[in-house]
Structures are given as structure tokens and as C-alpha cells.
Amino acid sequence: MKTEEIIKSIEAEYLKSDLPIIHVGDTIRVGVRIVEGDKERIQPYEGIVIAKRHGGINETITVRKVFQGVGVERVFLLHSPRVASIKIIRRGKVRRAKLYYLRDRVGKATRVQERFDRPL
């Protein structure tokens, strides 16, 4: 076996199978596991997916939201054990693979048109 095949077979054990199909422009809610002392809780983080990178076990998404007038972006490793759940709230209609231009927009200009032809 080639080295690539060996790596893919090892990574396949750690891939999550219950992830929804996520597209750039979608509004999603990510449940993030937070450990405080000996307690563990799930903190929701809701925002628009502005970028998707890589594939396989290294797949990441960048989620942006505006909190108290300040734009906050977080990068999530999709197959990480810290990501408890991902729920799609609404589908977005965009023509770009990366929505970095939303960083420069303010107020209603940051809205993304909703798409109805893809199921949630």
C-alpha cells in the first residue's frame, strides 16, 4: 500500500458520518463542547459560513457572526470532538466560494439571500 492510502485508511476511522452537507453562505448553529473544571457544557455558536477549506479529516469552516456590533469569526475543524453538533438554520444563495467581502459590509448589506432549492 502507498503511504497516501495508509493515511486515508487511518483517518477514515475518525471521520464523523452524521455531518450535514454544508455550503458557503449557509446560516448554521454549531454546538461547541466547553470544559470548565470538571463540568462540560455545549455552547451554541450561530453565524454564516464564509469559507470552507481542505477535505477529509482536516476540513474546516469559518463561521462569522456580528455580536454587539463587532464581527466575530471562528474556524471550526468539522471532525473535531469539540464540535458536538451542526444544524443548518437556512440556506444561502451566493456566487462565491469565499465570502470575505462580508467583512467590509455593515448592517443590512451583510445579509445573504435565502435559497429554497436545497433541503435543510
From Swiss-Prot:
Task: Show the Gene3D superfamilies listed in the entry.
Answer: 2.30.30.790
GO MF assignments: structural constituent of ribosome
Name a single GO cellular component: cytosolic large ribosomal subunit
Please indicate if the UniProt record lists Ribosomal protein as a keyword: yes
Question: One biological process GO term for this chain?
Answer: translation
Record keywords, A-Z: Ribonucleoprotein, Ribosomal protein
Sum up the protein's function in the record's words. Answer: This protein is located at the 30S-50S ribosomal subunit interface and may play a role in the structure and function of the aminoacyl-tRNA binding site.
Q: Which PANTHER family match?
A: LARGE RIBOSOMAL SUBUNIT PROTEIN BL19M (PTHR15680:SF9), RIBOSOMAL PROTEIN L19 (PTHR15680)
Tell me its family: Belongs to the bacterial ribosomal protein bL19 family.
Q: What protein name is recorded for this chain?
A: Large ribosomal subunit protein bL19
What gene does this protein come from?
rplS
